[in-house]
Structures are given as C-alpha cells and as structure tokens.
Swiss-Prot record:
Family label: Belongs to the peptidase C69 family. Secernin subfamily.
InterPro entries the UniProt entry points to: Peptidase_C69
Domain of life: Eukaryota
Active site feature: 8
Organism of provenance: Danio rerio (Zebrafish)
Name of the featured protein: Secernin-2
Gene Ontology biological process terms in this record: proteolysis
A Pfam family hit: Peptidase_C69
GO function term, MF aspect, one: cysteine-type exopeptidase activity
PANTHER family to which the protein is assigned, alphabetical: SECERNIN (PTHR12994), SECERNIN-2 (PTHR12994:SF16)
C-alpha cells in the first residue's frame, strides 16, 4: 500500500531573527491533493453551563467562554490545520509517528486540538496547557483524512504568541515541550526535542523506562527515546524538508519578514511547497505578531492550494469582521459523509467559490502566468500597506472588511 499523503512544515522567527520587533509565524498544510481547505471565522462566544461541543468525532464539555478564531481547515472536519485567535496566538500541527502505538479509535484529532487550544488559550503557553489537559482526558485518534481507509497519527504542535513560541511533541497521551524565546525554529513531521525539555508529562520518563526505551540513567532525549525504530517513509522524507527549512531560516536569520516567510513557504526545491501526484500544499498561512500589544496582529491566508500559485490575503481581528462566504465550503448537514455511520462511504463536492475560480485561472498558459504576476504584484502592494500601517505611517481602514475585500478582488481578477 502506498505511503499515505501527509506532511507539513511550521516556522517561527522571534527577534532578533526577525527584521522588525515582530514574531513571524508560517505554515504550509500538505494534505491529499484534492482536499479542499476553507478559511472560517468564529466570533468570541459565551456558553451555558454543562454544555458540550461536538468535535470531528466526539463531543466534549464546552468551556464558559471561547475566543474569536480564524481557522484554515480541511473542509470536512471540525478542527483546523492552523489558525489564530484574537489574543495573537497562532497554532499549527504536524503528523508524527513514535514508539507509542497510534490509536485507531475515534478520539480528538490533532486538528481538533489546534482549534481547542486557540478557542481556550489566551497565550501560547495557555494553549499548550489546554491541549495537554485534553490529551490526558480524551486522547488523540481517529481517521485523519476523508476516506474509509484507516489512517491515524500522533501530533506535534508549534504554538506562538507575541512573546514566545512553544514546540509541543506528543506520543499518545505523553508529551514534551520546548520553549523558544529568540531566533528561528522549524518543525517537519519528526520529533525535534532533544535534551532541552522545558515541560513534560509527569509520567513521561517512568513510562519510557518501564517500556525499556530508556535506562533511567544519564540525560533524557525525547527524540532519541520516542522516535520509532522503523519510521514510515513519510517521516524519512521529512528530514530533507526539515534541513531545507532550517537552511532557509538561517539564510534570513536577522532579517525575517512576512514576505521572507511567504518565500520560504513557496520554495519548491526543498519540498516545502509540496506538489506531487498524491498530495500538495492545500493551504498556507503567515502571521505578523508585533511585540507591541497596541499594534494589531495580521494573519495572511491563501484559502487555495500551492502558495507559489496563490495569493496571501490579510485578516485582522476587529469588533466587526465581515463573513467571507467565498472561502467557506458548502454545508451538507446530517447527511455529510463524515457524520453518517459508517463514515466516508461517499464523496461530496466541498469546493468553495474562490477555490473554483483559482482552479480555473491557474493554467500554464501565458494568460495564467500574466495573471499570476499581476496577483503577486497586488500582494506585494498589500504587504507594503500593512507594514506602513504597523509602523504607524497610515491608518488602518475598515479592518473587519480587509479579508473580504481581498478575496472579492482576487475572484474578480480571475474572472
């Protein structure tokens, strides 16, 4: 059986790695080739006591208050591949395999945990605490793609806010976390936390010792102890992307901007911009998180596949965010194949309006190339305006309409 298509790359730059006094976050979501990724916004909400929330496969107790979030997600599920909340927290996840067996039973997906961390955490560390507590209570498991063929994995996460970043790596309910306060860091479908463990599951070392994976003597390396003896080919291939991502970050260390992060996500030579027969980059995100709390965070999302052929469009949280139905997939209600048992017995069309327009326009013809050049020029102009706004040189106008206006303009250009 062919190796299942699943890989991702997450990046962060903190001062002095960044050119300005900003934290810069980036992620490519690499998924099955025809999977549609939508961008959805959910406002902050209050919830009645004892209420529950229905995640992709299971329901769990809801909290009293959830943060406003913007999410980029495979259109069939509840959670998200990546996203941000109103407090300037960004989270992205990655598939990983470890010595701990993967749970095929339905539990929380790593993508559910991304959304739950954003909805419930007002800092990167708070989101990490949310995720690890839910892991302990409900575990992780279930099908991670829209198919009846079983495919599950464990997860690693990059959690970022205006001040710091956390790498969280899991093995079943066990986990280790590393705090990053300066410079650049990337993760790619493999364990990376060695001896520098900032926080960990209380039973991490005792379980490792009981399983015979660690002698109990000497330094404890999470990567060495928990990496599988025979990793899937996908994890082995990720090493090339990890090295390529590290090299690109180091090349720009001290001068990382949102534009630099976008160029890294568009890099095909390293495999970071994925495009092959079975899978590709289906959505991308770059965020600017200024250290100054009086400045707004800006989140750029594509809502379309292949960042080298897509436009990053800015989203800023405000009191009145305009809904953007053009990047939201059709709803199928109780008859959705993810909701009917047994699951995934038939396929539905999840393409949203922008996805269709992007698909039609992205040809190899001269007209297609010319259109791409125009769109890239408009993107660079938008970036310059955002940077000027962050420097205080121009006033931000109607921030809640910004993402809508950019999506609307992109569709009109394609037509």
């Amino acid at each position: 059986m062919a190796e299942p298509p699943r890989s991702c790359d997450c990046f962060v730059s903190l001062p002095p790695g960044s050119k300005e006094d900003y934290v810069i976050f980036g992620k490519n979501s690499d998924r099955p080739r025809d999977e549609v990724q939508e961008v959805v916004y959910f406002p902050a909400s209050s919830h009645p006591p004892a209420s529950t929330v229905e995640c992709t496969y299971i329901s769990i107790p809801q909290v009293e208050h959830t943060n406003a979030v913007v999410l980029s997600r495979p259109a069939w599920l509840w959670g998200a591949e990546m996203g941000a909340n109103e407090h300037g927290v960004c989270v992205g996840n990655e598939a990983v395999w470890t010595k701990e067996p993967v749970n095929p039973e339905e539990a929380l997906l790593g993508m559910d945990l991304v959304r739950l961390g954003l909805e419930r955490g007002d800092s990167a560390r708070a989101a990490l605490n949310v995720i690890t507590a839910l892991l302990e209570q409900f575990g992780q498991g279930g099908a991670c793609r829209e198919t009846s063929e079983p495919f599950s994995y464990h997860n690693t996460f990059l959690l970022v806010d205006r001040q710091e970043a956390w790498v969280l790596e899991t093995a079943g309910k066990l986990w280790a976390a590393q705090k990053v306060t300066e410079g650049v860091k990337n993760i790619s479908n493999q364990l990376t936390i060695d001896f520098e463990i900032s926080a960990e599951h209380p039973d991490l070392r005792s379980v490792a010792q009981a399983q015979g994976w660690w002698s109990g003597e000497g330094d404890f390396s999470f990567t060495a102890v928990f990496s599988p003896d025979h990793p899937p080919a996908r994890m082995e291939m990720a090493k090339q992307r990890y090295r390529g991502g590290t090299a690109l970050l180091q090349q720009h260390n001290g001068s990382v901007t949102a534009e630099v992060m976008m160029s890294i996500l568009r890099d095909k030579a390293s495999g970071i911009c994925m495009d092959s027969e079975g899978f590709r980059t289906t959505g991308s995100m770059v965020s600017i998180l200024p250290r100054n709390p009086n400045m707004p965070c800006v989140h750029f999302l594509t809502a379309t596949p292949d960042p080298s052929r897509s436009v990053f469009k800015p989203f800023i949280f405000s009191e009145s965010v305009r809904p953007v139905s053009m990047v939201m997939s059709p709803q199928y209600g109780p008859g959705d194949p993810v909701r009917t048992l047994p699951r995934f017995q038939h396929q539905v069309d999840r393409k949203h309006e922008l996805y269709k327009a992007h698909q039609m326009a992205n040809t190899s013809s001269d007209a297609g190339v010319s259109l791409q050049d125009t769109m890239r020029y408009l993107e660079s102009q938008c970036l310059e305006e955002i940077e000027a706004m962050l420097r205080g040189e121009v006033q931000g106008q109607e921030l809640g309409d910004l993402f809508f206006d950019c999506v609307d303009a992109e569709i009109k250009f394609y037509q």
